[in-house]
Amino acid sequence: MTRRILPLVIFFVLMGFLAQSLFDSDSELPSPLIGKSIPQFTLQNLITEEMHSNEEIIGEISLINVWATWCVGCEIEHEFLVELSQDENLDIPIIGLNWKDDDQLAKLWLNQLGDPYSIVLKDPEGKTAIDFGVYGAPETFLIDSNGIIHFKHIGPLDREIFERDILPVLGELN
């Protein structure tokens, strides 16, 4: 009898741990890059086709948002990003990192939904995203004026998350 009960008990304990991890809504995975400089890169601007490097980000606090047209979460957060980019009380550039996407679809998407980005960099092979430790889109990074990563959010960004998680860090940086 004990031989039959013990596997059931172990099974239910494991299922409990699984259920807890599935319903844990913490989308801030620890990143080994927090407190470190942004990775070096040279990428082409999606709109102007100019080349940009990580050095250009240094000098002001900014957000880097990893997105793609095929990403459902990116569409969910996009309206908030447009609002954020137009907020005169919050002067923070949003740099878009278009990840593994089709250039024409990405340009069309921005034309139709609005372009919240001060610069839109394209990462067609995803190499720069890998250097940032990106798991999937959307992901957003808060970068200080020295190019140091202070915060990483995985998933769609909205006002609640921005005010709860990013604004306090911004306050410390200012």
Where are the predicted features?
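N-terminal targeting signals for export/organelle localization
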Residues: M1-Q44, N174
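Thiol/disulfide oxidoreductase modules built on the thioredoxin-like
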Residues: N111-P116, D123-N174
